[in-house]
């Protein structure tokens, strides 16, 4: 939020309080622990930290071999990916995600499970699209399965409700091109009260 960069005395007092509430130091400690881990180990570590009690149905729709494309809503952000990974990887350890390429810049080892996507329109180029499609082609030829969040963004808060943003057609196009079944996943979840409070303030 731009107001956090203000030099006002009140803001300078608020920042350390926010850092304490949000567990900033703990987060930095977690980052230090995971930044050198292999992709799958890293995901396991984060899943243990962030995933609480969950109820899962529809396991029978997960094939043990052959490519599938799982399309999913995106209510909570990173936690969505962790839940999906912890669920699917038990049966499909070859799973990969179409996700923000910035992740692979920060954590290069995540290239093992991330097809890099440039979500920012002003940075999206023919080269970046080819990079994404080349990753997908290689993965699907190896019969790997993919996860796509077709909205490309976190669900939008509208009052007290979450509204999924419009979906891009990328998943349908890939499924058609490679003759791969599409499997829908629906996550019923919300972020914390603090998350929505800060979203409102922002």
What is each of the regions a protein language model found here?
Residues 139-153:
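A structural motif
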Residues 24, 68-125:
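Catalytic core of membrane glycerolipid acyltransferases/transacylases, capturing the structured
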């Amino acid at each position: 939020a731009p107001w956090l960069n203000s030099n006002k005395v009140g803001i300078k007092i608020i920042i350390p309080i926010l850092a304490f509430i949000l567990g900033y130091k703990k987060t930095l400690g977690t980052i230090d622990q995971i930044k050198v881990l292999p992709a799958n180990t890293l995901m396991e570590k984060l899943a243990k930290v962030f995933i609480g009690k969950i109820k899962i149905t529809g396991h029978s729709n997960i094939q043990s071999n052959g490519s599938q494309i799982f399309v999913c809503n995106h209510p909570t952000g990173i936690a969505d990916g962790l839940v999906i990974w912890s669920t699917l990887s038990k049966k499909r350890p070859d799973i990969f995600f179409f996700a923000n390429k910035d992740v692979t810049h920060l954590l290069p080892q995540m290239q093992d499970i991330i097809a890099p996507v440039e979500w920012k329109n002003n940075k999206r180029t023919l080269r970046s699209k080819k990079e994404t499609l080349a990753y997908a082609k290689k993965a699907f030829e190896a019969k790997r399965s993919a996860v796509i969040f077709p909205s490309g963004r976190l669900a939008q808060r509208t009052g007290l409700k979450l509204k999924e943003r419009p979906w891009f057609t990328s998943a349908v196009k890939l499924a058609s091109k490679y003759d791969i079944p599409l499997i829908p996943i629906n996550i019923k979840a919300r972020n914390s009260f603090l998350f929505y409070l800060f979203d409102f303030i922002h």
